[in-house]
Every structure is written in C-alpha cells, then in structure tokens.
Amino acid sequence: MKHITGAYFSPTGGTKRALESVCSLFEGETELFELTGPDKKGKTFGAEDLLILALPVYAGQRPAVPGLLDSLKGDNTPCVILATYGNRHYDDALAQIKREMGGRGFRCAGAAAVITPHLFA
C-alpha cells in the first residue's frame, strides 16, 4: 500500500479509538481523516491506496448524516470497513456500507464489527 487513510465519524470517540487500534496493525504512517471535520474537502484515492472507514451503527444503520461520505472518491481503491456498535446488533450495516462504498469507487477488502461504548447506553 502506498498510503493508508483512516476516515471516521465518531461522536463519542469510541469509533475513533477502534480505528486507531486497527490502524496500529499496519506498518508506516496512517493519516486520520474526520468525515465531519473542518477539513472536509474531497479526498480521491487510487488503486495503490488503502482506506479504512470507521462508522458507528445505530439500529442497524450507518448514521443518517447528510453528505457524510460525499468527500470520499475511489478508483478501484481497497477499503476496509469498520462498524462499531453498542447495545444492539449491527444487522446488515456492513453490507449496506460495502454497497455504498462500491458506488464511490472502492472495493471491500475486509470488514469487521466492533463493540464499543454506545452513545445511548
């Protein structure tokens, strides 16, 4: 991989901590990109890059934040999806996110659901 980016939405910090743990498994530097942060400019990724996308799941769905993933554009870019959840099952959120990311030019290379403290706990 030429470059690894960890993109995340983490209202309570748990999803970001889970992402940081996964990113620490890779050699080299990983850039973290907050999807709702002030630097929301578009990011374009190539086939030699890796995106690790971390999102919380509420009631089996990714957050319904308008435009949350609009800044991510891939070109047959490998993507690892990390879904965090708390008090309820994540249902088919990984499959939903995989489909959405496929439409943005990413191909899913892996996925995981991780339990973290939940916003509504």
Listing of model-derived features with the role each one plays in the protein:
Residues 2-5, 10-121:
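FMN-binding flavodoxin-like domain, especially the glycine-rich phosphate-binding loop
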